[in-house]
Design a protein with these regions (language model features):
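Active-site loop->helix "elbow" adjoining a glycine-rich segment at hydrolase catalytic centers
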Residues: 154, 206, 234-237
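Alpha/beta-hydrolase active-site loop
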Residues: 199-219, 276
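Short glycine-enriched nucleophile-adjacent loop
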Residues: 237-249
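Hydrophobic h-region of N-terminal signal peptides that target proteins for export
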Residues: 17-24
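Substrate-access "cap/lid" subdomains that shape
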Residues: 216, 250, 259-368, 393-400, ...
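Non-catalytic accessory segments of hydrolases
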Residues: 24-200, 204, 457-470, 478-490, ...
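Catalytic nucleophile serine of serine hydrolases
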Residues: 232-235, 260
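Alpha/beta-hydrolase fold nucleophile elbow
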Residues: 221-233
């Protein structure tokens, strides 16, 4: 294991590069060796080759018109041209947000014994609809097309960016897939309901527009249009739920990788539910003046909108809402009616999703009453006998209700429509006393999938072996809709008749999910867990 000093040095350098990369792209002279994407006869995107020559990167490519001015709180408009020559060497600014994800990274670094002050927030802008592409070196494989993985970041739909340390895609691209990470409007800029505007789910529509751009330019990128996989974690996975359901995204992808989210099943909001907060934001920004509200809201400074929204929406989860324009029914209704798009699914959650977010003073009984509105019955107590530790019991409850049970329900729904489902349970805990206190936390699986340990995490040989295995599972799924492959432990398909899953920790095994009975109990108490 590396020393904390070396880890922190690498992390400092990495975040410095991230911040530098989020600045405006500088003009770098073209050369014969620079990789290119020829979008059309008039537009060329110039990227750069990785140090080992195995992959190419094209960073900060616009996929829609900037959502500013008249396009604030409007559906994204297609971008037809990136210019004659576009130098894609730097990441674009992140979408407007406070420092929530920066604080999250600080907490994780601190949890592993590092100095949280090395983590720096990236530049932000309302002009933020950009994507990044990592692909296998194209010069050696001009006649090949590759499966495409489109990654959607998390952050409660109010924070996060497409090039966080966990999401850099070059090592995954070495497995002969194309990795594309996309941005979308966040917070009140992306999920806003107000009578002055017809639509509510602007961030979701941004994701649809990014998929349209990718499909339109798939040949130039070198991708296979029949093998496009959307992949997301946390809120990113929650948005994938709606991408699997809404009409505008049908046919834009055929596979989905869904990591650690249950928001679309747990939250069933309508536009009307969110309008009161939208009106409050408008009132805080504009006062009592009700004249020309639409124009005045669009004219308000982005920084002021962000600052006011942080107060108005404090504690609010920015979920997609049924608005009759972009989302026509709740995701749960679409799932129950078996109306999801035909999509194969790889889905799962981590053992300690909720551990770092729990109130240490909360009792199991109070949590059940406050969060689920039920009492701590004898039947439930029996199901929680997995641990005598109160905090562990709370984690089992919160993780099951918030992540595991919704994932199992979605896997069942997809399996019922004869599409394929594959379910995992991630249990690996890093070595060391500090790591043990965090467990297999929310987001812990990401460095294994992307193979980004060296950027900021201490890594043992166990972690490296698991990384190779998980990266192969994920990329095999993108290639064939089946994660299994040569020399990999068998991953059983999840069906309506067989609930076997893959457990990924210190070892790989097949088992029934340890929270399966708890999920069945919760489902018996509620229409949806």
């Amino acid at each position: 294991m590396k020393s904390n000093k070396n880890i922190m040095k690498k992390l400092s350098v990495f975040f410095a590069l991230v911040i530098l990369g989020s600045c405006a792209s500088e003009h770098i002279s073209n050369s014969d060796s620079a990789p290119e994407i020829q979008l059309n006869p008039e537009s060329t995107i110039i990227g750069k080759t990785s140090d080992n020559g195995k992959t190419e990167a094209f960073l900060g490519i616009p996929f829609a018109q900037p959502p500013v001015g008249k396009l604030r709180w409007a559906p994204p408009e297609a971008l037809n041209d990136v210019g004659h020559v576009f130098h894609a060497h730097h990441f674009a600014p992140a979408c407007m947000q406070a420092d929530r994800i920066t604080r999250w990274y600080k907490n994780v670094v601190k949890g592993f014994g590092g100095d949280p002050e090395v983590v720096i927030k990236p530049a932000v802008s309302e002009d933020c609809l950009y994507l990044n592409i990592w692909r296998p070196s194209f010069e050696e494989n001009k006649d090949k097309t590759y499966p495409v993985i489109v990654y959607i970041h998390g952050g409660s739909n109010k924070a996060g960016w497409s090039y966080e340390p966990n999401y850099i895609g070059h090592r995954m691209a070495e497995e002969k897939v194309i990795v594309i990470s996309v941005a979308y409007r966040l917070g009140a800029f992306g999920f806003f309901s107000h009578p002055a505007f017809e639509y509510s789910n602007f961030g979701l529509m941004d994701l649809v527009e990014s998929l349209r751009w990718i499909n339109k330019n798939i040949d130039a990128i070198g991708g296979d249009a029949s093998r496009i996989t959307v992949m997301g974690e946390s809120a990113g996975a929650g948005n994938i739920d709606y991408l699997m359901a809404i009409p505008s995204s049908k046919g834009l992808f055929s596979r989905a990788i869904h990591q650690s989210s249950g928001s679309a099943i747990r939250n069933q909001a309508t536009r009307e539910d969110h309008i009161p907060l939208g009106l409050k934001l408008s009132s805080e920004l504009l006062g009592a003046d009700g004249i020309n509200v639409t124009q005045k809201l669009r004219d308000a400074e982005a920084e002021k909108v962000l600052a006011v929204s942080e107060k108005v929406y404090k504690g609010h989860y920015f979920d997609n809402a049924v608005d009759g324009k972009s989302v026509f029914e709740t995701f749960t209704d679409t799932l129950k009616l078996e109306k999801l798009h035909p999509v194969d699914l790889l889905i799962g959650s981590n053992e300690h999703e909720s551990l770092m977010y729990l109130d240490k003073t909360e009792s199991v009984g109070n949590w059940l009453k406050n969060q689920l509105g039920i009492d701590n019955s004898d039947n439930l107590r029996k199901l929680l006998n997995v641990s005598s530790n109160k905090r562990d019991q709370l984690n089992v409850l919160a993780t099951a209700s918030g992540f595991t049970c919704p994932a199992i329900n979605l896997a069942k729904g997809v399996a019922a429509t004869r599409d394929q489902s594959w379910v995992y349970y991630f249990t690996r805990q890093r070595d060391g006393e500090m790591a043990e206190s965090m467990g297999a936390y929310h987001g812990a699986e990401l460095p294994y999938v992307f193979d980004t340990h060296d950027d900021w995490l201490p890594t043992s040989q166990v972690d490296r072996r698991l990384t190779k295995t998980m990266k192969n599972y994920w990329t095999n799924f993108a290639k064939t809709a089946n994660p299994n492959g040569l020399y990999l432990p068998n991953w059983p398909r999840f069906t309506v008749n067989s609930s076997k899953i893959l457990v990924m920790g210190n070892d790989i095994s097949n088992a029934l999910h340890p929270s399966l009975e708890l999920c069945e109990y919760l489902e018996s108490r509620f229409a949806t867990p």
